[in-house]
């Protein structure tokens, strides 16, 4: 019985995410996760999307938690129900939008829990918004509204109703 409990404890410890960095400090983020710098630079070079925009989206959407999901709604105040959306991972990409990304880029192995893929997804999405909505790639505020509301929601200015 003790071995069983020990195995369960070790398993749970292995599932913990190490976020021992200050999410408000880009230098600390890259010092703790050096590959992330090259991933965000790759996205910048590929899509023309600033590193600061990528990181601000990821911080706001998932707080750098790779398995982030929206909270579950409560049924009768205590029973976990459905989630508000299918958002998942660093970028909090919805299932349908993630599938669009995979189709458009041919990146069939993309994973929303993978930082490189999440960064590339944000670059792809912002580039699409730049083309469709004519937003400057440095306009973080309006790009975030388009990202959060969807491009159609942005065009309808659905954010004004919130």
Positions of the model-derived regions?
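Catalytic glycan-binding domains that act on GlcNAc-containing polysaccharides
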Residues: 16-162
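Hydrophobic h-region of N-terminal signal peptides that target proteins for export
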Residues: 9-16
């Amino acid at each position: 019985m003790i071995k069983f409990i020990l195995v369960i404890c070790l398993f749970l410890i292995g599932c913990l995410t190490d976020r021992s960095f200050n999410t408000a400090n880009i230098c600390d983020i890259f010092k703790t996760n050096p590959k992330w710098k090259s991933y965000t630079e790759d996205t910048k070079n590929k899509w023309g999307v600033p590193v600061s925009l990528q990181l601000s989206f990821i911080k706001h959407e998932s707080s750098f938690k790779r398995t982030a999901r929206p909270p579950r709604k409560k049924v009768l105040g205590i029973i976990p129900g459905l989630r508000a959306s299918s958002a998942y991972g660093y970028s909090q990409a919805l299932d349908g939008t993630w599938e669009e990304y995979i189709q458009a880029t041919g990146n069939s192995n993309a994973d929303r829990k993978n930082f490189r893929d999440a960064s590339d997804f944000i670059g792809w999405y912002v580039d699409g918004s730049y083309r469709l909505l004519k937003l400057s790639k440095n306009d973080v505020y309006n790009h975030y509204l388009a990202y959060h509301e969807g491009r159609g929601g942005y065009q309808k200015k659905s954010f004004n109703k919130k």
